[in-house]
Curated annotation (Swiss-Prot):
The lineage of its organism: Bacteria, Pseudomonadati, Pseudomonadota, Gammaproteobacteria, Pseudomonadales. It is a lipid-anchor. GO terms for molecular function: efflux transmembrane transporter activity. Induction: The ttgDEF operon is induced in the presence of toluene and styrene, but not m-xylene. Keywords: Cell outer membrane, Lipoprotein, Membrane, Palmitate, Signal, Transmembrane, Transmembrane beta strand, Transport. Pfam families: OEP. This is Toluene efflux pump outer membrane protein TtgF. SUPFAM superfamilies: Outer membrane efflux proteins (OEP) (SSF56954). One of its GO terms (cellular component) is cell outer membrane.
Length: 480
């Protein structure tokens, strides 16, 4: 134990009275490059351009080209309640930092006092009972000499917690931008699904009426009528489902906006507008561009500083207190000659026996740092996985959408041919119903795939730390 304390004391002397452990950023537990394989083989050249070209591309006002979507995102950034809470958290941590920083400076107080008391005879210096008065005015100052860096360590920890809160706010803003974009895309996509269900229902109802007429003249069977009615009810279910979904999408979007949707919101072709191209850089760039990773590192730095404060608690604390002023038995005598007073009170506190409290506190701070290391590494791994998922989606959705578009075109041709053969008397109407069903399913799937493709691009934008006009390429400092 003595050797342990001696080594700490020696390290204090050699490091300028700071007991904060030397910080070394943990190595990123991810591979140097993005995944390779069939899902990534068709990515366009330039996808992994160096990170210095990415700041402008990650500006959300550039990435989202639809003016209506940009307007909604701006509204959410001004009104969202979750974002407002994170902003208030930043202010709270800023105030805590000011509290810890104030401990590094001397404290001064001034006061004016008056005392009037009756002393019994046995306590009176004259041997007679009497009433005494005393008036005083003082200016006092106290200052703790931070010889072992305890106060400085606490101030640094508070600063890092404040910076972590600021990065968390940035992360929340990026998440909000992505959530609003996806919610708006989902709303418009479900409106398109609802329009498709309505038009398909009308088509199925016309087919049902036609088959009923054929049934009356004996050219269609009861089975034909039942099959046609089944398609009508299926389309009616889809219409009801998407009517509900559109309403729920609007509710979700309004919650994100923090206010009602504008009544005059124009209808845009957002589902047909491609988003701006993104370059991903290298995995190491995530350390600079993801605010959640930077927040995790700030929390790790705070835990590291708290270890310094816990170490310093083993050593003496020295407090200097001084006071000066005047005192008199008469109020008008406070500023007469000979009424001055002063006091100087240095104090040294040395922990001798704390029943293991200091050792337990140091062990606790070391464990908290290990926890923060694990959280920092997990945030990097999570970011890597999110970007890799986005790249896999980008590498495959183009082909999937084209295949689904070809399927829709084929089923439209199939439907026209089936109806032509029915009109010519070659086939019965069941072939037409089957073609209608296949076309409806293909159109629905295309709308779903298109939404998923756009949503995956938005998630990739979020995973890359997008959303800010100027994303610092360096860790935040006190000046930031």
């Amino acid at each position: 134990m003595k050797t342990h304390y001696l080594s700490i004391a020696l390290s204090v002397a050699l490091s300028g009275c700071s007991l904060i452990p030397d910080y070394q950023r943990p190595p990123a537990p991810i591979q140097a490059g993005w995944p390779q394989g069939e899902a990534y083989a068709k990515l366009k050249a330039g996808t992994h351009r160096p990170s210095q070209t990415r700041d402008a591309e990650l500006n959300w006002q550039v990435f989202f080209r639809d003016p209506v979507m940009r307007e909604l995102i701006a509204t959410a950034l001004n009104n969202n309640r979750d974002l407002r809470q994170t902003a208030l958290n930043v202010e709270a941590y800023r105030a805590l930092h000011r509290i810890e920083r104030s401990a590094l400076l001397p404290r001064a107080n001034t006061g004016v006092g008056a005392t009037r008391q009756r002393l019994p005879a046995d306590l009176s210096p004259t041997g007679e009972a009497g009433i005494q008065s005393q008036y005083d005015t003082t200016l006092s100052m106290s200052y703790e000499l931070d010889m072992f860096g305890r106060l400085r360590s606490l101030e640094r920890a508070a600063l890092q917690e404040y910076l972590a809160a600021a990065e968390t706010q940035r992360s929340m803003q990026i998440a909000l931008i992505a959530d609003v974009a996806i919610a708006y895309l989902s709303w418009r996509s479900d409106q398109a699904q609802l329009d498709l269900a309505r038009s398909t229902l009308a088509s199925y109802e016309n087919s049902l009426n036609l088959i009923k007429s054929s049934r009356e003249v004996g050219t269609a069977s009861a089975l034909d009528v039942r099959q046609a009615r089944s398609l009508v009810e299926t389309a009616r279910v889809q219409q009801t489902l998407y009517t509900r979904q559109v309403a729920q999408d609007m509710n979700a979007l309004q919650l994100l906006l923090g206010t009602k949707l504008p009544a005059d919101l124009p209808i845009s072709d957002v589902l047909d507008q491609p988003l701006a191209a993104l370059s991903t850089g290298l995995p190491a760039d995530l350390l600079l561009h993801r605010p959640d990773i930077r927040a995790a590192e700030h929390r790790l730095l705070a835990a590291n500083a708290n270890i310094g404060a816990a170490r310093a608690a083993f050593f003496p604390s020295i407090t200097l207190t001084a006071a000066a002023g005047t005192a008199s038995h008469e109020l008008d005598g406070l500023f007469e000659g000979g009424s001055g007073l002063w006091a100087f009170m240095p104090r040294i506190n040395l922990p001798i026996f704390t029943a293991g409290r200091l050792r337990g506190n140091l062990d606790y701070r070391n464990v908290i740092k290990d926890i923060n290391v694990a959280e920092y590494e997990k945030s990097i791994q999570t970011a890597f996985r999110e970007v890799a998922d986005g790249l896999a989606a980008r590498g495959t959705f183009g082909e999937q959408l084209q295949a689904q578009r070809d399927l829709v075109d084929n089923n439209q041709a199939y439907y026209k041919l089936a109806y032509q053969r029915y009109d010519e008397g070659v086939d019965n109407y069941l072939a037409v119903l089957d073609a209608q069903r296949e076309l409806f399913a293909a159109q629905q799937q295309f709308l779903s795939d298109r939404l998923n493709q756009l949503s995956s691009e938005v998630r990739l934008f979020k995973a890359l730390g997008g959303g800010w006009d100027n994303i610092s390429s360096q860790p935040l400092t006190a000046q930031n």
